Amino acid sequence: MSGEVPPNINIKEPRWDQSTFIGRASHFFTVTDPKNILLTNEQLENARKVVHDYRQGIVPAGLTENELWRAKYAYDSAFHPDTGEKMTLIGRMSAQVPMNMTITGCMMTFYRTTPAVLFWQWINQSFNAVVNYTNRSGDAPLTVNELGTAYVSATTGAVATALGLNALTKHVSPLIGRFVPFAAVAAANCINIPLMRQRELKVGIPVTDENGTRLGESTNAAKQAITQVVISRILMAAPGMAIPPFIMNTLEKKAFLKRFPWMSAPIQVTLVGFCLVFATPLCCALFPQKSSMSVTSLEDDLQASIQKSHPELRRVYFNKGL
C-alpha cells in the first residue's frame, strides 16, 4: 500500500505476523539490515519523531504507509525497545553482520598461535559484551562491577577453551583444529550472556499482559529469555564457523592460496559474511522477540498478584532481548 497512511496501524508490533517463523524472519531481515548503520542521527531522530507522533495520533500530511514502516524499522534498529534509549552503534543488530564477519573471519584465520588466540578472543568478547549489554531485556541497570565481572569471565572462558582445545588438537587433522574458535565462542556465549544480564536473573524482567500493561518482574521469565538468546547466538555463529573451515581446508591446498597466502583472511571474512547475512536474521527469528509463558510458570508471589488483579489471564509476555 503506498497511499496516505490510515490512523489505526499498530506500529508497536512488527509489520509481519510474529506467530510464524516466516513472519519473524521477514522482521529480522529488516532489523539486521547492515544498511541501517549508515543512517545519520538526523534520519534516526526524524524516524523517532514520526513513530512517536503517530502513536499520539498525529499523522504528518502526505505520510504513506510504506514511509511509516520505514520510519518504524529505522527507529527499531537504533532505539532500545524497553528503555527507548539510542543504542551504541556497534551494539545494534544492524552492525552484527559487518562486525561479526570481520572478527570471526580473523579468529578463524589466526587461530594457530597463542598470541593470536588471545588477541582475537579478547576482541570478540569485547564486542560481545557491548552487544549483550546493548540488547539486554528490561530497564535494570548493571553496575560497573557487574559489567567487569561478566566481561572478564567471558573473555577468560573463551581464551581458556580455545587454548585448551588448541593443545588437544595439535596431533589431529588440521580440519578439526579449524573448529576450535567455534567451540570457544559457544563456551563464551554460555558465560557472557547470563553474566551480562545477571541483574535480570536477580530482580527479574518486566512481564505484561497482551496489551502491554506491566504486571511485575519475573526471574523465571528472565531465565527463559536468556536461555533462548544463548541458543540463538550459538546457532547464529554455527554456519559462519562450521562451513568456511571445509572450504578453506580445500582452498589452502590449491596453488592459488599457496602463491597468495595473504588472500586467506579476506576469503575467510567473505565466506563468514555470506553465512552471517542469512544466519543472523534466521536465528534471531527462532524464538519470538515478544516471548510468553504461562502464568502458572511464574514465581508464586507474582502468580498470586496476577490472579488477584487479572483472574482471567493465562499467559504473560516479555521482551526476551537479542
Curated annotation (Swiss-Prot):
Pfam family, one: SFXNs
Keyword Nucleotide-binding: no
InterPro entries: Mtc
Localization, UniProt: Mitochondrion inner membrane
Catalysed reactions, semicolon-separated: L-serine(in) = L-serine(out); L-alanine(in) = L-alanine(out); L-cysteine(in) = L-cysteine(out)
Keywords: Acetylation, Amino-acid transport, Membrane, Mitochondrion, Mitochondrion inner membrane, One-carbon metabolism, Transmembrane, Transmembrane helix, Transport
GO CC, any one term: mitochondrion
NCBIfam families given in the database record: mtc
Source organism of this protein record: Rattus norvegicus (Rat)
Transmembrane domains' residue ranges: 103-120, 147-167, 175-195, 229-249, 267-287
Family to which the UniProt record says this protein belongs: Belongs to the sideroflexin family.
Residues in the Mitochondrial matrix compartment per record: 2-102, 168-174, 250-266
Name of this chain's protein: Sideroflexin-1
Lipid bilayer topology: Multi-pass membrane protein
Function: Amino acid transporter importing serine, an essential substrate of the mitochondrial branch of the one-carbon pathway, into mitochondria. Mitochondrial serine is then converted to glycine and formate, which exits to the cytosol where it is used to generate the charged folates that serve as one-carbon donors. May also transport other amino acids including alanine and cysteine.
GO molecular function: L-alanine transmembrane transporter activity; L-serine transmembrane transporter activity; monoatomic ion transmembrane transporter activity; transmembrane transporter activity
Taxonomy of the source species: Eukaryota, Metazoa, Chordata, Craniata, Vertebrata
Predominant subcellular localization, coarse grouping: mitochondrion
Name of the gene: Sfxn1
